[in-house]
Amino acid sequence: MADHPEPPLTRIQQKNRDLILQGALSVFSVNGFRGATIDQIAEAAGLSKPNVLYYFASKDDIHKSLLTTLLDMWLAPMIRIDPGGDPLEEVMAYVRAKLDMSRRYPRESRLFAYEILQGEPHLTEILGGRLRNIVDRAAAILQGWMDDGHLAAIEPRHLIFSIWALTQHYADFDVQVRAVLGPGHDPFDEAGPFLDNLFRKMLGV
């Protein structure tokens, strides 16, 4: 007998699921996977523990679902790189999108960094396939532009790594950045023109 697809979630079910994932983000970003409990997640979500377990069978399931959701969000700007667009402007649009994500989603960025440093198996499993495939696609687009003389020739994957490092730093090390800059500085407003200038000089031909 063929499997039947699960019916779509109702509006209330989707709302509760989102509340659980937001609560899980708060808990995991402070305590990590090992230190987090279902009770803490339920409290952060404003739901009962049985209600949480209605939507997710275990802490494992919540963690995997949260990381998958974060990865989807994290990869979206890279997927939007258009091979038919202006090469330098496509790269700069990606840099701006990544910096904007660091501004708007600092907890998500820090959780991702924390889980990578901890070597969480869920993240290794998720990253090993989809992330590599999307990076391979972006690297192939960049390499094509370089081969055609539209961008300076550098190793495309390390270019991608440098974009990640130079944008996510402002979320992952926010306290350090603000302490060094001192009062009256907006790190993101100042980082935007700096990164634009840096990558244009690096890639311009």
Enumerate the language-model features and the residues they cover:
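Helix-turn-helix
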Residues: 19, 23, 27-61, 65
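Hydrophobic alpha-helical connector segments
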Residues: 79-108, 156-163, 192
